[in-house]
């Protein structure tokens, strides 16, 4: 309705090489385009708060100018909006701290490779692929998010090496939420090069999909104990799982009408 599209410039060769945490060769800008006129209108430089800006999500409400970006390497969520003067503004609203690890020379970044906004624009979900946790934030006030849920699966911190009896080689990566906001499906593979770099056992074990039960009214998350898909046992496997979609629509493909 507002004919605006947002794009990020996370890197030129990031998919084909190892993730070099100490390098500064990655993108840190957001670009806004007038989709009707097909021309760029704004570029936001995010600096160190926006290293490897990856997923961008607007509110589903087409009258809203609010949107969010997950900066993967900084492990931050950037919030943007248009002010009363029609100018685009941005701020960092979530900052996931790096965590120490005995085998790493530097603290481990979360690597926030995905974000998602619920259909009612009430909750924002994010992952920390290297830490191993999924989070739910109430964004009723998009300037002041509140953490309302957190679960652990895999990751390098050792908080949940097994889920529903299955050892996880990887961490929470892509995820998809049902339109009613109650079922969140999470998979574990990012890119094969990064998978092999940080989770080499995924070559033999394959990927996993779990389901998280979400409370869309009061907030909260818990791993469903009766659901798990082991892609390591697929024919001609082990296989890896990246992204999922709902045939009847989901919170990524649908908007308000």
Per-region residue spans from a language model:
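Beta-rich catalytic cores
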Residues: 26, 52-54, 111, 171, ...
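Single conserved hydrophobic/aromatic residue that forms the stacking wall/gate
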Residues: 2-15, 113
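Short loop/turn segments immediately following beta-strands, especially the blade-tip
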Residues: 32-39, 79-93, 136-148, 199-201, ...
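Conserved beta-strand position repeated across blades of beta-propeller domains
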Residues: 57-59, 116, 176
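Short, conserved, GDST-rich strand-edge loop motifs in beta-rich repeat architectures
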Residues: 11-26, 70, 77-80, 187-206
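Short coil/turn segments that connect the beta-strands within blades of beta-propeller domains
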Residues: 63-65, 120-122, 180-182
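Surface-exposed loop and turn segments in beta-propeller and other repeat-based domains
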Residues: 40-51, 88-108, 148-167, 224-257
